[in-house]
Design a protein with these regions (language model features):
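Accessory carbohydrate-binding/adhesion or oligomerization-edge regions at the termini
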Residues: 16-80, 156, 160-165, 170, ...
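Extended acidic/polar, glycine-enriched regions
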Residues: 146-150, 221-299
């Protein structure tokens, strides 16, 4: 019997290895349950270029003719499709089998992200619709499935990156990649999974670290409230630090004292384990969730950003999260971790995550490794003066902040990038609404309305400047005691902006100017183009970057060190930086590493440049 059991396990291991699920790791490590099924792997699909699939009732499909590997987008090599042209309509299908022991539980279908609009059908019946290409969403499919049975799951996707109604980030609005715009991502691009949850189970929790009072505050939300209890335990490497029990309702607040508190920081990224158990009236444990928390505080005093009540200088790198074979999707969990390690090896203490909402497992590794991040949406491509666009974006941004607010590695919320809209009503209204909304969801972090753009509502002031001469950069950033401000442009407005948008055709619009009342950072600079290939001259002419490229490697190092030292020398006025960028991305070849993550430079020299902090004065 023992021999048979051993043989069975060996055969099972071989079978699993042969049919390995891509991205098989648990996708939500800060809210983890045991009863789950990963739906990544082989699906069938069909493009719907005529947009007639609904009319032809493709939602009733039991399988399409072509195969795709989920969670990789059809534009990517890893999907097995690699279709590069625009995809406005697309259909997916796979079967889902509901385990028998999931009876009497809610069956929840989770999508890490689907770009852009998606509709979910079970056995031909409409179950849900979602707007937003970078935010996660959950569908309760309990009414449509039965335990012990197999069902048809169909996902319909719509996307039009050229519509101006949906944020698209750095996706091309032309057929081919150009400048700082790259291959598009359509459809499913993050993990899809099912989980079984008791009807009284936890829907979410908000964790608020309070290092001043040495306590962790937890606010739960439940699917249903039927009079049970919530038990929360805080542990330090298996040892109980604090334990509290409250009523299992969404008005409860759990306050966990944290004696001998260990704070989270890049120097010591300590994480406490958090265990949450829902107990019904009969004393049965009906839901268990594993989580973690970092005790850290970020706030602003005057012109400086503080971490754990100490001024903290951020040496960030721009990370766009693109991969040669997966586009927006990392090929593996190890690749996510490796990107952070590469950045730290280069001397950075964090990253501005640029024009893409990174998946939860990236933040998990940032939390574990002690890596600072700024959370940003993929805002490019949308018309900020358009009311429908604003409606779409506000919904998506809400879901982004609610999902990621518990990660200690996130210091700043930045919904948009380089938005310059000469408008006195709609753009200011959008920025002010985003500010109020973000503060209501998460009052613990600074809000940064638009990176390097027109600052309407913000807690920090940022500029972008790609001047390649260090002396000129210093003059531009700080000349005769005056910091670089937003441009003063005279705008010739189109007649359609008359009246409702508050501007007349001949009005001059002046962008908001810095008032020296908040931290000031240069959160894009550098971007030095360098491609030391065998075809040097040809590569330098066809690749893309900022300014005239250096003529030699030594000239590159000298320019880089000069630019960084210039910014550091202004630390009394410029409190942090973000260098462009971590890796090359397609034709944009100004990364510290190549697109495949191999080193481009002598990393000891690079680390020596980027690991420097300003001199204490």
């Amino acid at each position: 019997m023992k021999r048979i059991t051993t043989l069975s396990f060996f055969m099972l291991f071989c079978w699993i290895t042969a049919f390995a699920i891509p991205r098989a790791e648990y996708p939500r490590p800060q809210f983890e349950r045991n009863a789950w099924i990963n739906l990544n792997g082989e699906w069938t699909y069909s493009f719907d270029f005529g947009g007639s699939g609904l009319e032809r009732e493709w939602f009733k499909s039991t399988g399409f003719d072509q195969k795709i590997t989920v969670p990789f987008c059809p534009e990517s090599k890893l999907s097995g499709v690699e279709y590069k042209d625009f995809i406005n309509h697309m259909w997916y299908h796979r079967t889902i089998s509901i385990p028998q022991d999931w009876a009497n539980k809610q069956v929840l279908l989770n999508f890490g992200a689907v770009y852009y609009k998606s509709e979910i059908y079970i056995d031909g019946v409409f179950a849900a619709r979602h707007f937003g290409g970078t935010s996660s969403f959950q569908v309760d499919i309990t009414p449509y499935v039965k335990a012990g049975q197999t069902h048809n799951l169909v996902v319909y996707v719509e996307s039009d990156v050229r519509s101006t109604h949906q944020p698209s980030g750095k996706q091309n609005l032309q057929f081919a990649s150009y400048g700082c715009n790259y291959t598009r991502t359509t459809g499913i691009w993050q993990t899809v999974w099912m989980e079984a949850v008791h009807p009284e189970g936890l829907q979410s929790v908000q964790m608020i670290p309070d290092i001043d009072q040495q306590q962790l505050i937890i606010r739960p939300r439940f699917y249903k409230e039927l009079g049970g209890k919530l038990e929360v335990t805080l542990k330090d490497n298996g040892k109980v630090v604090s334990k509290e029990t409250v009523a299992a309702n969404s008005l409860s607040t759990v306050i966990l004292p944290v004696k001998k508190m260990k704070t989270w920081s890049p120097e010591n990224p300590f994480l406490y384990d958090v265990e949450l158990r829902v107990i019904d009236k009969a004393g049965n444990v009906v839901d268990e969730v594993k989580s973690y928390a970092g005790m850290r505080k970020v706030h602003i005093e005057g012109k400086k950003i503080y971490l754990n009540n100490q001024p903290y200088y951020q040496r960030l790198v721009l990370d766009q999260g693109f991969y040669p074979d997966g586009i927006w999707t990392a090929p593996s969990d190890e690749a996510l971790k490796k990107d952070i390690q590469l950045s730290m090896e280069a001397g950075f203490n964090g990253a501005r995550l640029h024009q893409k909402v990174f998946e939860e497992r990236f933040y998990y590794w940032a939390d574990k490794l002690g890596y600072l991040t700024w959370g940003e949406a993929s805002s490019w491509g949308m018309d900020c003066n358009d009311i429908e666009t604003a409606r779409n974006f506000i919904t998506e941004w809400t879901e982004i902040v609610e999902r990621d607010r518990n990660h200690p590695s996130i210091l700043i919320w930045t919904p948009t990038n380089e938005e310059f809209w000469p408008d006195r009503v709609q753009y200011p209204r959008l920025m002010q609404d985003l500010y109020k909304l973000t503060k209501a969801i998460d009052p613990t972090r600074p809000f940064h309305g638009t990176s390097g753009g027109s600052h309407i509502a913000t807690d920090i002031w940022t500029v972008h400047n790609y001047e390649q001469d260090p002396a000129k950069l210093k003059e531009l950033l700080y000349n005769d005691g005056k910091l670089m401000e937003a441009p003063k442009w005279e705008i010739q407005l189109m007649p359609k902006n008359i009246g409702f948008n508050g501007l007349k055709y001949t009005d001059q619009y002046t962008f908001p100017q810095y008032k020296h009342d908040m931290p000031y950072l240069i959160d894009e600079f550098g971007g030095i183009k360098w491609n030391p290939s065998q075809q040097m001259e040809s590569a330098q002419n066809t690749s893309w970057g900022y300014g005239e490229p250096p003529h030699s490697l030594e000239e590159f190092y000298a320019r880089l060190e000069g630019l960084v030292n210039t910014v550091l020398s202004l630390s009394d006025h410029v409190w942090g930086y973000c260098y462009t960028q971590l890796t090359d991305v397609e034709q944009e070849q100004n990364g510290i590493y190549y697109y495949d993550r191999s080193p481009k430079f002598d990393m000891k020299r690079i680390h020596a440049i980027f690991s420097k902090n300003p001199e204490t004065k």
